[in-house]
Amino acid sequence: MNQTRRETWLFWLFALLILATGLGLRDPWPADEPRFALVAKQMVESGDWLFPHRGSELYSDKPPLFMWMQAALLWLTGNLRIAFLLPSLLAALGTLWCVTDLGARLWTRRVGLYAGWATLLTIQFTWQAKKAQIDPVVVFWITLSCYALLRHVLQGPSFRLWMLGWAAAGLGTITKGVGVIALLLLLPAAVASLRGWAGVRIHARDPRFWLGPLAFVAACGVWLVPMLVAALGHGGGDYRAYVDDILLRQTVTRYANSWHHGQPWWYFIEVLLTAWLPTALALPWAIPAWRRRLRRRDARFLIPLGWVLLVFVFFSIPSGKRDMYILPALPMLALALAPLLPGILRRANAQRLLLGFVLAFSLAALGAGLAMLLGEPGFERKFMEGRDAHVADGLAWMFAAVGGFGLGSALWFGRRRAHAALVAMLTALWLLYSLVGAPLLNDGSSARGLMRNVGAAIGPDAELGLVGWREQQLLMADRPAADFGFKRDVALQFADGVRWQRTRPRARWLLVEEGLGLPACIDRARARDMDVANGRRWWLLDAEATRGCR
């Protein structure tokens, strides 16, 4: 086995180890994971896969493709803990394959591996890959689209890849509306082609060019056409409101007039310099090198870097911003960085910077662990609200172990191999988080602990209704639970809940979020305080506790 093959096996071993460890060891956590998992679970149970539901209401915030994936895996495995995380794992591995293979085709196999390592070791990429949000799947579709379009433009013509690139962008669009940004890659490609850069052709005069847009429309139509036919033929106002919300308010209106997550225009620069560590540490050496490559008219750098810049601009325009919005740009940045990394890592200053990062990260983790073990800091008390005391001890030892291992790695590998110390420290971080941290945090973060206590309090034969609920309560309930709407005003939910309870007063209970305060009509002497979960206090009410409510 030659060295490149050994390095390839080593990369994929670490990728599987880092990304797959912990699969099946936790439940969905807020804010988004329980929502998608609940929708997927209800799809399997109800058989209605076309119109997602959150409890009794239609869920129109996102297209259903991601939830379809979770639901299909739940149907196949019968295990929610595995099914809800598996799409993110598969998408992350697919993204790594795209970037490593593209690097190998445009440069060498070793350059492809550097692109893979730069993507895998970026903190935000791995953090998102170990969560069950939509973003890892969107990143995969966008990266697959860029992969196919770049191969067509730089190594083509290949109209099969051209169609694949457009189709992947379409599937990204029906996963999350922003999937269409993959097609922005054609703008720098067109500029390079029009200016006569060597080896760049879009082949726009070929009649087969139009197969690409057709593939995009066909991919979007997989969901859009049957949804529109069913919704408009249904005749119900709820379904027409669903169409208006998902096609207009959640896309065009949300982009043009964001109603939450307000951030300044430079927010994503901060994200790049923090969440994209340690990869961002190479930028001081990469930027001058990129400038030299662009002067030489090397389109392998212009097209991905131009697209990354367009993605940053696109997401910086609206006021609403979240850190994961620009994650799709990371693989192409890593691709453009990869040919430069061997030279950068040979620089003594780059190794010193990496070593400084390892030492700073390790000392911070060790300090946090020791502070939790030896003191009683305010951040610990706030963090541990609603959790058992043993969780704090376990997390403290986890932080201390990560910090100690990182310091040991820095001493072992030294200044000249700081990149190896970095890989060792981050691997230890993700393994310990997956095997120790996540299971310890699970009961409090997922509402499993709360709902287990609720089930024990009301007994196996009782019925449960939820008021002011969050998705994790309905998902983790040990029995079918009644809900009275999700977006409705809590006072209206409570009034309907009381009426529901009175039809079988001895068997029905209400779980109510305290919010700004329980209704004054409740008999607090009869109400059961179920403690804090996910930062909210919950009360369990029997019919006697709500007797004075109308």
Model-predicted regions and their roles:
Residues 1-351:
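Membrane-integral, polyisoprenol-dependent glycosyltransferases
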Residues 2-5, 163, 255, 289-550:
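Membrane-embedded architecture of ER/inner-membrane glycosylation machinery
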